[in-house]
């Protein structure tokens, strides 16, 4: 039996939960080994690894008992990426990165590209530069003893962001390139399995809220899947596509069979998601060899769950891994570079040495002159303020004065006329001035006391009380608006329960309240 599993892992370096929840958070490499063992598959295809080649470490890339193959995003770090881990008893005979062949090395590649004349070289490079496809080709033996070729296409198809129409075009062009390559492999005599995150819920049964989605059947991605797949799985139908959705072949009417849930809304708790992950096999392969196709929703650690299939064939491992295998990368191959490669003789002409010496002498003289000027203009210690008293706590909460303070070196002219007018002369004037001065001090002390009281009340008051939602009378959660617009950055309260249909009383109610600025 050959068992294949696909999983959008949502970051291979993140501290995974679920399968690897017993590992410390800084041992992601050990967690990957545990995940592969727990999935118990001969071939494991991972999507959205979110790792670039320079960030790939040896413990992540080389796992005992497996040979691995990675495709990286060449434009962005921490984005996209796919990886395939094969047990040593399922070592492929060939491996290749990308669908177009532009990244092929002509040594150990899969080949069979089909007619790609409708694409420009720039378009092909853009489609393959995000690290979304990885091909491994294996030798398999059927129960009749016949040896055949099986090609696995591990894909992470693009997401069509509604706010970026160009990404829908990119997604559909990627679909087209994937179909051309898969059909070319079929025409060359190889069996083909397309598995991974296709980022499209094919039919209404594959989406929890399909009835409320406008023009669900008219979506370009769903129309593409209609042309690729045979209707009604293994049964006869009006349209016979080259591939079969293996899960719907075995479970044609299973509802609630989802593989992806929104982590923001907590929709996984109530199983309100969509089926975006598939194992698609060519018709002959699925009908003759597929024994089961399954989902693993109990496996946590990502916003997706693993999917897989079991084939009644045995793998014929290659004697040597293809060159794309990560153990052959220079950084992991264990070959030591000679130190002479880092030492380059530096030759200079006499004229260059003489000009450099003159430049250095001039620089030294100029530096000495600058140091002398700095010493002559440096202020004496007595001129610098030496006040180091402890600051009042309120000074950190008061706005700094906008007008600059006067320099201590500037002497203001004395005003004898004003001082003569303001100085009390008679005993009555002195008494009045004394009373006024006392009242001013009392008022100032009172204002300062009130200011301190209001300040400490605001500090010690604590956060505002969390409101209760109207539907369940439960404490709400605070969210922040991240959509560009006039309310960007504003905070609001909403029901803390997971998202679901309005008819479900255990799902989120429609409570909404803007948060008051503190």
UniProtKB/Swiss-Prot annotation:
Organism whose genome encodes this protein: Homo sapiens
- Cite the Pfam families for this sequence: Exo_endo_phos, Zn_ribbon_GRF
How is the cofactor bound, as the UniProt entry phrases it?
Probably binds two magnesium or manganese ions per subunit.
What is known to happen upon mutating residue 396 to A?
Reduces 3'-5' exonuclease activity in presence of PCNA. Does not abolish the 3'-5' exonuclease activity. Does only partially redistributes together with PCNA in nuclear foci in presence of oxidative-induced DNA damaging agents
pH dependence of activity: Optimum pH is 6.0-8.0.
Q: How is it modified after translation?
A: Ubiquitinated by the CUL9-RBX1 complex. Ubiquitinated by MKRN3 at Lys-371 leading to proteasomal degradation.
Q: Site feature Transition state stabilizer: at which residues?
A: 199
Q: Where is this region: Disordered?
A: 355-407
Residues at site: Interaction with DNA substrate?
304
Query: What is this protein's record name?
Result: DNA-(apurinic or apyrimidinic site) endonuclease 2
Residue ranges annotated as zinc fingers (GRF-type) are 469-518
What's its top-level EC category?
hydrolase
According to the record, mutating residue 197 to N results in:
Abolished 3'-5' exonuclease activity. Synthetic lethality in a BRCA1 or BRCA2 mutant cell line background
Subcellular location(s): the record lists: Nucleus; Cytoplasm; Mitochondrion
